[in-house]
């Protein structure tokens, strides 16, 4: 659906980004995403997605505090009426699964509740922080995602920064920005404040295709 004048004004800061434009914004408004995270890691990335104009966002949260999540959904509706934020129902197939893994509890919950469809953006919020871009579900996520499901270590102060980097990658995929969507794995170096790509080791496991 073409953007209205009000929407052009609302999203003008991102529409003018080279290779973004109105078409990418229309894709964002028509997209559906599942956001998996603990309550403490949820609000800032969610506000970023809503502010950018992602059309439908389903929250997948381990904690069952309905009042808190209901209040958060109302807050996001006030932030941007173009976005619909809901929780408790994952009936429709999303365009993207976005997971912020801050603890083993979130991993277990995601494995049980989240739809196993691609593409996906998965971020580890402990140390060392990692972000994986998965265009399709790997045959064996433990091997293919480079340790994303290894034992969790100490939570670091850069967890929020990792979440913001991952949110940017999610928006690039949803908006089909440039070459977004290619499989990749990054490790965050907090001392140098950079995200370094991790080379594909080409390893195979028993469940991988030949």
Question: Where are these predicted regions, by residue range?
Answer:
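Adenine nucleotide-associated cytosolic modules
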Residues: 1-210
């Amino acid at each position: 659906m073409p953007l209205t004048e009000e929407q052009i004004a609302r999203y003008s800061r991102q529409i003018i980004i080279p290779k973004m434009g109105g078409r990418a914004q229309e894709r964002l408004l028509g997209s559906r995403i599942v956001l998996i995270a603990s309550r403490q890691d949820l609000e800032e990335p969610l506000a970023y997605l809503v502010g950018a104009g992602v059309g439908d966002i389903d929250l997948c949260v381990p904690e069952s505090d309905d009042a808190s999540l209901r209040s958060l959904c109302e807050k996001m509706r006030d932030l941007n009426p173009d976005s619909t934020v809901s929780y408790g129902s994952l009936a429709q197939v999303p365009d993207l699964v976005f997971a912020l893994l801050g603890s083993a509890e979130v991993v277990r919950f995601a494995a049980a509740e989240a739809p196993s469809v691609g593409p996906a953006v998965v971020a580890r919020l402990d140390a060392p922080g990692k972000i994986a871009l998965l265009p399709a579900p790997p045959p064996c996520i433990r091997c293919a995602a480079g340790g994303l499901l290894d034992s969790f270590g100490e939570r670091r102060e850069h967890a929020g920064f990792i979440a913001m980097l991952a949110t940017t990658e999610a928006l690039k995929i949803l908006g089909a920005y440039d070459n977004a969507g290619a499989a990749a794995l990054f490790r965050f170096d907090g001392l140098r404040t950079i995200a370094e790509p991790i080379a594909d080791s080409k390893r195979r496991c028993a469940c991988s295709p030949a």
